[in-house]
C-alpha cells in the first residue's frame, strides 16, 4: 500500500496525475488488487503462461489502457506458487518503456535473500514482510514492520 501511495505521489508531483492504473500479474499476491483500490488506482490483470508473465499480453494491456495512464506493474516474484518469473528484466524494460514503474511485492523474498538484488532486475519500488523473510512474528512484533525500498527517482 505505502509503495503505491509513493508511486502515485511521484506521478502527481511530476504532472502526470492521470497515471491511475496499476497492472498486476495474475500470479501476484492476493492482497495486491486491494492495495491498489485503497489508494485510488484501478487494476488491470496481466495473464501468465505456466507461471510466467505473458509478455505479449502485457504489451496488449499497455496498448489497451494507454501507456500514459499506467502508474506501475505490480508483481510478486517469486510468485505465491513459488515460481520465479525468469522474464523479469524484459518485464521491467516493457514497463519502463511505457513510462511506468515496476513494483515488486517481496512477499516471498526469503527465496532470494543473499542470492540476487532486486534492483538488478529493474524494480523501482518494492516491499518485503519481515514475518516471512526473516521469520519474525507477524507484524514484526508490532504493526507496520515492513521494509519499503525505492530507486532514486
Q: Where do the model's predicted regions map?
A:
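Conserved PLP-enzyme active-site core in the AAT-like
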Residues: 1-153
Amino acid at each position: 500500500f505505502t509503495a503505491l501511495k509513493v508511486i502515485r505521489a511521484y506521478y502527481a508531483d511530476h504532472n502526470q496525475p492521470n497515471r491511475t492504473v496499476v497492472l498486476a500479474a495474475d500470479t501476484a499476491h492476493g492482497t495486491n488488487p486491494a492495495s491498489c483500490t485503497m489508494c485510488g488506482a484501478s487494476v488491470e490483470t496481466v495473464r501468465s503462461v505456466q507461471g510466467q508473465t505473458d509478455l505479449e499480453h502485457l504489451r496488449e494491456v499497455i496498448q489497451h489502457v494507454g501507456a500514459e495512464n499506467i502508474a506501475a506493474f505490480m508483481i510478486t516474484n517469486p510468485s505465491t506458487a513459488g515460481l520465479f518469473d525468469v522474464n523479469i528484466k524484459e518485464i521491467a524494460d516493457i514497463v519502463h518503456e511505457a513510462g511506468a514503474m515496476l513494483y515488486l511485492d517481496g512477499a516471498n523474498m526469503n527465496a532470494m535473500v543473499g542470492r540476487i538484488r532486486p534492483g538488478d532486475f529493474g524494480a523501482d519500488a518494492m516491499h518485503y514482510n519481515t514475518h516471512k523473510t526473516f521469520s519474525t512474528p507477524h507484524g514484526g512484533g508490532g504493526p507496520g514492520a515492513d521494509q519499503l525500498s525505492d530507486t532514486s527517482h
